[in-house]
Each structure stands twice: as structure tokens, then as C-alpha cells.
């Protein structure tokens, strides 16, 4: 079809119902002498009629659900990645726990040196720490890779790491007693100690 552009515009106005009477007359006169334009207009009328005839059709109620159900399943890695992005705090906490646990495990394996807390009235003989009878040791007492003998009083907690404890009949501990001889106990103890030092958390007495 090689009709002038203004004729094509008149066709569109005619189909939209916006054509002026004098323009409609001009269009009809042209169509009488141009078989191509007449055919083109007829095809457009058929297309419009087809669209209008299907306007009442609606998709089935479960159409969307069925389409979604038949889509390819999301890869597991994509699902995991989305979960990780949605829970950054949990991921950070888990990574922190893993890194700290690894560090504490390494320190447990490599640390075999004897050490003791620094209260002045503790008596140290070789790898044995003694709380003398009649003495009151203020604060927490920690002994690593050694033996603790309590004959007096400890006003605080007692922690024995990879060692042993003996309490005489007159010995007394006002706080808690922790004996750590397994790597998992050591890791848990270090995590709690780190938490107390960072957040100022105190353990409740049992």
C-alpha cells in the first residue's frame, strides 16, 4: 500500500470514531478508487473485531500458581546466597564463633606453660599453688597446667585449666569452681571470659 500519509491518518480516525464528516467523505471517495487502501482498512477492522471478541476471556483461577509451579526450581546455591544476604548479623556471629573457636583450640594445643594469677598471698612451689591456712585470697584464682591446694579461703572463683585441685577440710571457696581438662571446656571457658571482659557480664552463682 502506497497511499498518502494523510489517508492513513484518516483511516485511524475513522476506526477510533473521531473522524469529521467531511474527512469521512474524503476517505470513502478515496477507498472507492484505491483497492489497496480498502483492503488495508478491512484488515484493521477485522483485527479490532477479534480483539473486542476476546475481551471477556479471563485466565483460570489457578493459572498463575500452575505457571510458577512449572518454572525451573531455584538452585540451592542461589537460595543459600539469598538467605545469607537476608541474615548478615547471624552470618557475622557464626564467622566470629568459628574464628574464635579455632584460635582457642590452637592456644589449648600449644599452651603447656604453668601460670597462676598474681595474688600476693598465694604460695607457689614448682607447679603447685597453695592457699595457706588462715589466709584469705581476694579475687579470682586461675591456675594453668599445675596443681592448686586450698587450705585457706578464696574470696572469688577458682579456675583450674589442665591441672588438679585439692581442698583441705578447712579450705573454702566463695565463688564457683571450674575444672577445665577438655578442649571443648577450654573453648567455652575462653568464650565466656571474652564475653565478660568485653560486655562486663557476670556469671550467676549456682
Curated annotation (Swiss-Prot):
Organism (species): Bacillus licheniformis (strain ATCC 14580 / DSM 13 / JCM 2505 / CCUG 7422 / NBRC 12200 / NCIMB 9375 / NCTC 10341 / NRRL NRS-1264 / Gibson 46)
Function, as annotated: Is the anti-sigma factor for SigW. The presence of RsiW leads to the inactivation of SigW, and its proteolytic destruction to sigma-W activation.
Transmembrane stretches, start-end: 88-108
Topological domain ranges for the Extracellular compartment: 109-206
UniProt name for this protein: Anti-sigma-W factor RsiW
Any Pfam family: zf-HC2
Family named by the database record: Belongs to the zinc-associated anti-sigma factor (ZAS) superfamily. Anti-sigma-W factor family.
PTM description: Is processed by three successive proteolytic events. First, the extracellular region of RsiW is cleaved by PrsW (Site-1 cleavage) in response to cell envelope stresses. Next, it undergoes cleavage at an intramembrane site (Site-2 cleavage) mediated by RasP. This cleavage uncovers a cryptic proteolytic tag with conserved alanine residues in the transmembrane segment, that is recognized mainly by the ClpXP protease, which completely degrades the protein in the cytoplasm and leads to the induction of the sigma-W-controlled genes.
GO molecular function: metal ion binding
Cytoplasmic side: 1-87
Highest taxon listed in the record's lineage: Bacteria
CC cofactor note: Binds 1 Zn(2+) ion per subunit.
One GO CC annotation: membrane
Record key words, sorted: Membrane, Metal-binding, Transmembrane, Transmembrane helix, Zinc
Subcellular localization: Membrane
The protein's required cofactors: Zn(2+)
Positions contributing to Zn(2+) binding: 30, 34, 37
Topology versus the membrane: Single-pass membrane protein
Main localization, broad class: membrane
Amino acid at each position: 500500500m502506497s497511499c498518502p500519509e494523510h489517508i492513513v491518518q484518516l483511516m485511524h480516525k475513522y476506526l477510533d470514531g473521531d473522524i469529521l464528516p467531511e474527512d469521512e467523505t474524503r476517505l470513502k471517495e478515496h477507498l472507492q478508487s484505491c483497492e489497496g487502501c480498502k483492503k488495508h482498512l478491512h484488515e484493521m477492522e477485522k483485527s479490532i473485531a477479534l480483539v473486542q471478541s476476546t475481551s471477556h476471556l479471563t485466565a483460570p483461577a489457578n493459572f498463575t500458581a500452575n505457571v510458577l509451579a512449572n518454572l525451573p526450581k531455584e538452585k540451592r546455591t542461589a537460595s543459600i546466597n539469598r538467605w545469607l544476604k537476608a541474615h548478615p548479623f547471624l552470618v557475622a556471629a557464626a564467622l566470629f564463633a568459628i574464628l574464635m573457636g579455632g584460635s582457642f583450640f590452637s592456644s589449648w594445643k600449644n599452651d603447656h606453660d604453668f601460670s597462676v594469677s598474681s595474688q600476693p598471698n598465694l604460695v607457689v612451689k614448682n607447679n603447685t599453688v597453695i592457699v595457706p591456712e588462715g589466709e584469705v585470697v581476694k579475687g579470682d584464682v586461675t591456675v594453668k597446667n599445675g596443681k592448686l591446694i586450698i587450705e585457706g579461703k578464696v574470696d572469688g572463683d577458682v579456675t583450674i585449666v589442665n591441672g588438679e585441685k585439692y581442698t583441705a577440710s578447712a579450705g573454702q571457696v566463695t565463688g564457683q569452681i571450674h575444672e577445665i581438662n577438655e578442649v571443648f571446656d577450654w573453648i567455652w571457658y575462653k568464650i565466656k571470659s571474652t564475653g565478660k571482659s568485653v560486655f562486663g557480664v557476670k556469671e550467676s552463682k549456682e
